[in-house]
């Protein structure tokens, strides 16, 4: 992850809006969970949605300003301000790890340690989303430092001895789906991962 805290980027993350695709994903994959970890929780954007679906919600992020904002949502039982690779020494295991738009911020050398730590923390499911680098929006944020193809990342995830992962599309964001001329594109983006601007890697525990 980039060294230090970029305060302009922090401000941008504080201004982010809820993505309905993520709320629907939480409703589907977190519902009924005893506990969930919001990995790279940022400002707590999805804390309330996680709280509606899980009995216990904890978060971890490395940015102190974002952690304070997440705490202010009141959705989390606990927030830890630390790199995600330290989750094992900071928090108890959870049923589900929700990891939305985090991995792209890690350099290649940080990816496996972070994944190992998060997988060790999850007893049942890993719910990971990342931008599809075939789309321009994935390149607009200078902190998106991980270079990956969708197939390469799936293979990297499936090096795990704990989880088996599948790659799934999420479709277009709501503000694009409302445009009539995007409807055929959304139909493709909901069926085929390579056509989806954001993709899901869903991990089920196997060992």
Which positions does each model-derived feature cover?
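A short glycine-rich, Lys/Arg-flanked "PGG" loop and its adjoining helix->strand segment in the class I
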Residues: 112-126
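Conserved N-terminal segment of class I S-adenosyl-L-methionine
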Residues: 1-92, 96-98, 109-116, 169-171, ...
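Acidic carboxylate diad motif detector
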Residues: 128-130
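Short catalytic/ligand-binding loop motif for oxyanion handling, primarily in non-cytosolic enzymes
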Residues: 46-47, 134-139, 175-176
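Short catalytic micro-motifs in class I SAM-dependent methyltransferases
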Residues: 100-105
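A C-terminal cap/extension of S-adenosyl-L-methionine-dependent methyltransferases
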Residues: 166-207
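Acceptor-substrate binding/catalytic loop of class I
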Residues: 137-152, 156
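A SAM-dependent methyltransferase catalytic signature shared across enzymes that methylate proteins
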Residues: 154-172
């Amino acid at each position: 992850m980039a060294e230090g805290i970029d305060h302009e980027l922090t401000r941008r993350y504080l201004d982010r809006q809820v993505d309905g695709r993520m709320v629907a994903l939480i409703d589907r994959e977190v519902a009924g969970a005893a506990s969930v970890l919001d990995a790279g929780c940022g400002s707590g954007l999805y804390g309330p949605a996680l709280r509606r679906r899980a009995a216990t919600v904890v978060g971890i992020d490395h940015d102190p300003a974002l952690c304070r904002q997440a705490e202010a949502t009141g959705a989390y039982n606990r927030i830890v301000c630390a790199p995600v690779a330290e989750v094992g020494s900071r928090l108890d295991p959870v049923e589900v790890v929700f990891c939305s738009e985090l991995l792209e911020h890690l350099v290649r050398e940080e990816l496996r340690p972070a994944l190992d730590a998060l997988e060790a923390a999850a007893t049942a499911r890993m719910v990971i989303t990342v931008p599809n680098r075939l789309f321009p929006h994935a390149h607009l944020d200078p902190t998106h430092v991980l270079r990956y193809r969708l197939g390469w990342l799936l293979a990297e995830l499936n090096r795990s001895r704990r989880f088996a992962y599948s790659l799934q599309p999420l479709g277009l964001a709501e503000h694009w789906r409302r445009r009539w001329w995007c409807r055929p594109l959304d139909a493709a983006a909901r069926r085929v991962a390579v056509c989806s601007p954001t993709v899901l890697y869903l991990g089920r525990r196997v060992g």
